[in-house]
Structures are given as structure tokens and as C-alpha cells.
Amino acid sequence: MATFSAAYPGNLKGDPFMNDLRYPIGRFSPGPNPTPETRNRHIEEISGTPARLRRAVAGLTTDQLRTPYRDGGWTVQQVVHHLPDSHLNAYIRFKWAMTEDAPTIKPYDEGAWAALKDSELTPVDVSLTLLESLHARWTVLLRSLKPEDYQHRFTHPESGPHDLDWLLGLYSWHGNHHIAHITSLRERMGW
């Protein structure tokens, strides 16, 4: 079972979303004023996401991979394919924010992407390998940034302006969030 950083407010007792299968580690909530230690912890979480995801799906059968993690939710296979889709977007957002002046980024419809045939027909190992390669590059980029670089901003058309500290925290949480969908399903099903 994956472990999660206690830095996420959603991990605190009393979070009403902790019993919601959609948010097994709670909702994302950025912490106050990130420190170098917080950034390093987030980078380590991102760096380790591919290995934790690979462990989370190890040994699952085709039928198990096609099982939704909750009623009305994505299948385990769709969750696996979603992670590189989403994290590719995050990686590009980091690059835009570092190379352009407060760019407006393009959102994508994650549900529509998850419903495309590649999420159904592609073996999960393809996305696991893609995520490993992506995170190897992304981690190099993240570790190369100076503290002031994390103040670079971008605008999301739906949620407004954000800095790279916020994006770093979000994607540190995001990988753990989806891995917990899989590990909590395995626990509930006795897999």
C-alpha cells in the first residue's frame, strides 16, 4: 500500500471527504507559504509516483484492471492511463510558466480523454513506462528550479491564476490521490 505525506490537509482527522471514495486521501488544499523542505518533499512525491503506481497495479488481472474503483468511477485501467495524460499537461504547464509571461494554459476534458479507445485498448504497462519516462524528465526540471522560479505564474481559464508552488503541490497530491483509488479498491476487494 502506498504511503502518503501528512502534509496534505485532507489527511487530517475530521476531513468530511476522507470517507468519500472519490477522495481517499482528502481533497487537495495547498499549504501556507511553501518552504524549501516542502518543495523537496513534493518533488520526491512526484519522483516516486511511477514506482508507487506500478506497485499498486502489480499482479492485477485484466478483469480487475477493468473494475471501476467506485460506482460510476473510472476503471483501474482508466486511472492508470489518466496519470500520464494529466502529468504530461502539468509538465507542459511548468514549461510554459517558465518560458512565457503568465501564460493562459489550455484545459482539457479529462473524462473525455479517459473515454477514448486508447484508455481501453492500450496495456497499462505502456502508460506505466510513459509515466516513468515523463517523471524522470519532470523531476530533473523541478530540481533545477531556483526557489524564486516557483513564483512564476500561469492562468487556468477555469480556476484562475496560480504559481508553480501551487502546481507542484497539486501534482504531488494528484499522483497519491489516484494511487489511493487503486489501493483502496484492492483493500476493499481483498486483492
Go through the PLM ranges and name each one.
Residues 2-4, 8-25, 29-30, 66-111, ...:
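Short, contiguous alpha-helical
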Residues 34-38, 76, 113-127, 157-166:
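Acidic/His metal-coordination segments adjacent to aromatic residues that form catalytic metal sites
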Residues 38, 45, 71, 75, ...:
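Alpha-helix N-cap/loop-to-helix boundary motif
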